[in-house]
Curated annotation (Swiss-Prot):
It is found in: Endoplasmic reticulum membrane. This is Acyl-lipid omega-3 desaturase (cytochrome b5), endoplasmic reticulum. A motif (Histidine box-2) lies at residues 134-138. Its EC number is 1.14.19.25. It catalyses: a (9Z,12Z)-octadecadienoyl-containing glycerolipid + 2 Fe(II)-[cytochrome b5] + O2 + 2 H(+) = (9Z,12Z,15Z)-octadecatrienoyl-containing glycerolipid + 2 Fe(III)-[cytochrome b5] + 2 H2O. GO terms for biological process: unsaturated fatty acid biosynthetic process. ER (microsomal) omega-3 fatty acid desaturase introduces the third double bond in the biosynthesis of 18:3 fatty acids, important constituents of plant membranes. It is thought to use cytochrome b5 as an electron donor and to act on fatty acids esterified to phosphatidylcholine and, possibly, other phospholipids. Pathway: Lipid metabolism; polyunsaturated fatty acid biosynthesis. Residues 1-28 are annotated as: Disordered.
Length: 383
């Protein structure tokens, strides 16, 4: 086992601290994934199309009601409240479409595909394109090279990036606006587009699926353009555009926090050290306060990553049942108040210090570029 821990002071967390606590999160777990599966109650695996559709109905009704109320009152005092609320619901709709992509929505593939296309196209997400890349993320979670979402940059790639690109990636809130760019261009060091049927993201057999989803996405975009001419662009921006930006910020923040920002530095793997189980155990549960229910318990992320076929409405029970097997490999999330303000601190702190991982070693930890913000500060002084 090779652990890349050069320049120890630049590594988030300290191996000495882990040894003092008697626990190393990068050590082989003493249990197998079958042990976790056996601990989860049978009812947690049952999918109910009616129950899943009830959440879709709830969210669509809430989105429509909010939009009608905002247009009716048309008050600049209320618009900011509407934007936050509606953007939050757009994120909830995304989560339901995400469930369709995993097949946890129902055991009926056609229903999953139809509902998934409707939900994701509405918020300008190419359903199959994202579904397939997200499947890659789950199949390779925690792998430095093969993971798909918020992948750590190897040191050589990081240091070859223009300084402006590094600043864009590691200056809050800019990373929280990355999702549309990711859909078109993926992450640094990776090629392909979620809209192109011939992208390296997809197998030849998946090209028709990608074309279908890109067509649905295009229809939604054309509808928004048409409404801009039919009504006026400012109204479309207020009713849809700003909530879309809030949704993107929710998506980027939540997906980042599920894989970064824990108080204890967590490992990433390569080569023979990686396994599906070890990669899944590097994910993090989060408590989103009042948003837990609104966002369909997306914060129960560890069990979701290991068993994505479990419906979201059973994830709390499944997590509770699996904790005794996971032991210290499960990191109990900090209890949130009504509004999860504490997560903002975790997000900002992680982005400021989790910059790259070593080019070598099968178990690596994030390291910090001590000159990233110093360079920017010195340059501003010169100017």
């Amino acid at each position: 086992m090779v652990v890349a821990m050069d320049q120890r002071s630049n590594v988030n967390g300290d191996s000495g601290a882990r040894k003092e606590e008697g626990f190393d999160p990068s050590a082989q777990p003493p249990f197998k994934i079958g042990d976790i599966r056996a601990a989860i109650p049978k009812h947690c695996w049952v999918k109910s199309p009616l129950r899943s559709m009830s959440y879709v109905t709830r969210d669509i009704f809430a989105v429509a009601a909010l939009a009608m109320a905002a247009v009716y009152f048309d008050s600049w005092f209320l618009w900011p409240l509407y934007w936050v609320a509606q953007g939050t619901l757009f994120w909830a709709i995304f989560v339901l479409g995400h469930d369709c992509g995993h097949g946890s929505f129902s055991d009926i593939p056609l229903l999953n595909s139809v509902v998934g296309h409707i939900l994701h196209s509405f918020i300008l997400v190419p359903y199959h394109g994202w579904r397939i890349s997200h499947r890659t993320h789950h199949q390779n979670h925690g792998h430095v090279e093969n993971d798909e979402s918020w992948v750590p940059l190897p040191e050589k790639l990081y240091k070859n990036l223009p300084h402006s690109t590094r600043m864009l990636r590691y200056t809050v809130p800019l990373p929280m606006l990355a999702y549309p760019i990711y859909l078109w261009y993926r992450s640094p060091g990776k090629e392909g587009s979620h809209f192109n049927p011939y992208s390296s993201l997809f197998a030849p057999s998946e090209r028709k699926l990608i074309a279908t989803s890109t067509t649905c996405w295009s229809i939604m975009l054309a509808t928004l353009v048409y409404l801009s001419f039919l009504v006026d662009p400012v109204t479309v921006l207020k009713v849809y555009g700003v909530p879309y930006i809030i949704f993107v910020m929710w998506l980027d923040a939540v997906t980042y926090l599920h894989h970064h920002g824990h108080d204890e530095k967590l490992p990433w793997y390569r080569g023979k050290e990686w396994s599906y189980l070890r990669g899944g155990l590097t994910t993090i549960d989060r408590d989103y306060g009042i948003f837990n229910n609104i966002h369909h318990d997306i914060g129960t992320h560890v069990i979701h990553h290991l068993f994505p076929q479990i419906p979201h409405y059973h994830l709390v029970d499944a997590t509770r049942a699996a904790k005794h097997v996971l032991g210290r490999y499960y990191r109990e999330p900090k209890t949130s108040g009504a509004i999860p303000i504490h997560l903002v601190e975790s997000l900002v702190a992680s982005i400021k210090k989790d910059h790259y991982v070593s080019d070598t070693g099968d178990i690596v930890f994030y390291e910090t570029d001590p000159d990233l913000y110093v360079y920017a500060s010195d340059k501003s002084k010169i100017n």
